[in-house]
Amino acid sequence: PSALVPRAGSGRGPEARTEPVPDEVALAFHPRTLAQVLLLRTHLQGDDRTDRFILGALAGILHGKTASYLSTIMPNTFSMAPRYVCDYVARTGYEPPARDAFDALAAKLGRLFRQPLPTTAGIALHGDARTAGRRARAALRAHGLPDRARLVVTSPPYLRVLKYGYYNWLRTWLLGFDAAAIDAELDAAHRREPY
């Protein structure tokens, strides 16, 4: 059976064992690396902008094929299916490399801050892209900025990506989200018109 750990972002200690670590998550990481990821997952708060930035950086190094990633079991572009991960480990005897999550995160943050911060003010919004225009105008006005966007970056959904949550299940687990709930909420029509 899986170990029970505190919920993502709860800030609780090890005594607050409320949710299991999925087997496919445990198989993806060296035990020491997993312990560090669990500590970060528990104590970083998604509603704090600094912690959210750090969580984003951590999600970016969660899995990939080079030494800068915490797990090498899958590419960094998407997560292999959970069942595939379990089958792959059983079939190949895959042993995850020991990585220091804190060192890897520090290196990632160093790469992110290699260039100076932009001098132009901006905003970031979280929500449905179909209502982004109205929300962006209001947020820009609230910050004393002109109420028209000059650049919009959205993610997800991507057209023709059918199951965004499913293909990012390891990252959604890290952030405390349910991949199936994300897929149920996203537009399955994959048409440009609603946007």
Ranges and model annotations:
Residues 135-151, 157-195:
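SAM-dependent methyltransferase catalytic-core segment centered on the flexible catalytic loop
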Residues 1-4, 104-112, 168-170:
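Charged, low-complexity, helix-prone segments enriched in Lys/Glu/Asp/Gln
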Residues 1-46, 177-189:
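Conserved phosphoryl-transfer catalytic core
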Residues 32-154, 159-162:
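SAM-dependent nucleic-acid methyltransferase catalytic core
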